[in-house]
């Protein structure tokens, strides 16, 4: 299904689920998916070009998402995504991609929206065997664990506070 073909009702449900506490992981071209754009509130546009060598640097070794990785890992062939990436400033940037053609990209970005956690991970072009790389698999596994809900609500409300702060 093409990004634009996702019904708005589905986007509404995904957004509400994240705001209520569901974790969400967006891979590669999901940066242009309707749910990601809705959750980011921007176009999520970026620069790109055909496959080149990428070195992915761990810029936050304390993050649970980067546990078990070295200083960097390499992807022999990956679609280049380059800045400017039109997203809000991440709450936490954990991975930075550098390409042999000189571009850099915010490759692993963490966000909090409402009660939910979001992780965007850039690698994964369909014409490249990226998901067979052990470090890429580890990032995704770690991200799934990181995104597990810590707190969930059943509905999104804005209740009136019925009790006074203090008695007179």
Set out the residue ranges of the language-model regions.
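Mature, folded catalytic cores of secreted/periplasmic enzymes
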Residues: 10-14, 70, 74-78, 138, ...
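Catalytic beta-strand/loop cores that center a nucleophilic Ser/Cys/Thr
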Residues: 45-120
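Secondary-structure transition/capping residues
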Residues: 25, 47, 76, 151-155
